[in-house]
């Protein structure tokens, strides 16, 4: 739901478009690098997160890390294919589907070399948090805490 309580949804690029800042272009690969991502205005329904889609299938960790190096206030959400992030009214992200969600939290980044390096160079990021959530696990966008939820129960 958005701030007015209206349910919103998007798939693929439509999911990325929901937030205030969206990744309009980005190089694939695991290493963040200066200038490898172009952000564009999104629909602006939230400024709390940046969404990237087809995340693991297209090796997009580096571009999400780069986007957060530019905008460390936001939480990065990488959606695997066949997977959705349901955000409850209490700002808790729930995973639905057969894949996972990668949550990247830049709130505690204590150093980023983004301002000191030339375009195309790798970015140094210290203090970045990364969570891999599957169905049953959650992440609260307000407290920025991940929880294993139902996954803690032993397999029967």
Walk through the language-model features, giving the residues of each.
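C-terminal and late-domain segments of enzyme folds
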Residues: 22-156
């Amino acid at each position: 739901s958005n701030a007015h309580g209206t349910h919103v949804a998007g798939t693929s690029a439509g999911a990325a478009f929901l937030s205030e800042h969206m990744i309009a272009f980005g190089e694939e690969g695991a290493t963040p690098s200066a200038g490898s991502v172009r952000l564009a205005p999104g629909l602006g329904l939230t400024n709390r997160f940046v969404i990237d889609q087809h995340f693991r299938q297209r090796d997009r960790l580096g571009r999400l890390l780069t986007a957060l190096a530019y905008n460390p206030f936001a939480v990065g959400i990488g959606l695997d294919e066949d997977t959705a992030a349901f955000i409850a009214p209490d700002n808790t992200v729930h995973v639905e589907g057969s894949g996972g969600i990668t949550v990247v939290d830049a709130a505690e980044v204590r150093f980023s070399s983004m301002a000191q390096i030339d375009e195309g160079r790798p970015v140094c990021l210290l203090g970045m948090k990364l969570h891999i959530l599957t169905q049953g696990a959650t992440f609260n966008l307000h407290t920025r805490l991940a929880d294993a939820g139902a996954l803690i129960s032993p397999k029967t």
